[in-house]
UniProtKB/Swiss-Prot annotation:
2-oxoglutarate binds at residue 165. This is PKHD-type hydroxylase P9303_20491. Binds 1 Fe(2+) ion per subunit. Residues 80-174 form the Fe2OG dioxygenase domain. Fe cation binds at residues 98, 100, 155. One of its GO terms (molecular function) is 2-oxoglutarate-dependent dioxygenase activity. It is an enzyme of class 1 (oxidoreductase). Keywords: Dioxygenase, Iron, Metal-binding, Oxidoreductase, Vitamin C. Its cofactor is Fe(2+); L-ascorbate. It comes from the Bacteria. GO terms for biological process: DNA damage response; intracellular iron ion homeostasis. The keyword Oxidoreductase applies. The keyword Flavoprotein does not apply.
Length: 221
């Protein structure tokens, strides 16, 4: 399944988030405290304490944006968005190659997301590297954009060599656990919606939407 790269937050919302997060200096802690056994050995960053007031308020803002975004809903078919946290990496910090846990305390991880909150020119290094079968995809997006990718992927964050990287990360438990099935449904839904926008409703299109809905019902969990 190819990742989805998508603008989620406008400039004003990003500025509000960044100011709120960076003002609360007392709530940041060693990121290894939230990592699994395998990942803790290669994790070197700071994370906002998940149950702090700042984390709760801003996590809810991000979740609401994700839940109301039509493209995110069509791509991810989210049943539960969970584990949302904020991390920052300064000079010398990063996150070595690892795979996310299959199950968090808050739910199953089918899809992972990273929402960038720092402009790419404000720091050097810090790219998200997602391992594919033959190579590695490097991602460093403008502030407000996010990438959603399968949680089954090996991935890493390059060491930051200048500036500071600020992101929001989290996981999605999808109604469809299979990446392949989710890709098929996403393509079918996108095609049907494009036909609807161009030609309007028709009996033939009703059959396509019926097939999509029944496939979702059959494949869903």
């Amino acid at each position: 399944m190819e990742p989805l790269i998508h603008p989620l937050l406008d400039e004003a919302t990003v500025s509000h988030l960044r100011a709120s997060l960076l003002t609360d200096e007392t709530s940041w802690q060693d990121g290894r405290k939230t990592a699994g056994y395998q990942a803790a050995e290669v994790k070197n960053n700071l994370q906002l304490k998940r149950y702090s007031k700042t984390a709760k308020e801003n996590s809810q803002l991000v979740i609401e944006k994700l839940e109301s975004d039509p493209l995110v809903k069509s791509f991810a078919l989210p049943r539960h968005i969970h584990g949302v946290m904020f991390s920052r990496s300064g000079i010398g910090q990063g996150y070595g190659m690892h795979v996310d846990n299959a199950y968090m305390s808050s739910g199953r991880s089918d899809l992972s997301f990273t929402l960038f909150l720092s402009e790419p020119e404000s720091y050097d290094g810090g790219a998200l590297c997602i391992q594919t079968l033959q190579d590695s995809k490097q991602v460093k997006l403008p502030a407000g954009q996010l990438i959603i990718y399968p949680s089954t992927s090996l991935h890493a964050v390059e060491t930051v060599t200048a500036g500071e990287r600020l992101v929001c990360v989290g996981w999605i438990q999808s109604y469809i656990s299979s990446n392949e099935d989710r890709t098929i449904l996403f393509g079918l839904n996108a095609g049907a919606r494009a036909l609807l926008a161009e030609h309007g409703r028709s009996p033939e299109l009703d059959l396509i939407f019926q097939a999509y809905t029944n496939l979702l019902r059959r494949l869903g969990s």
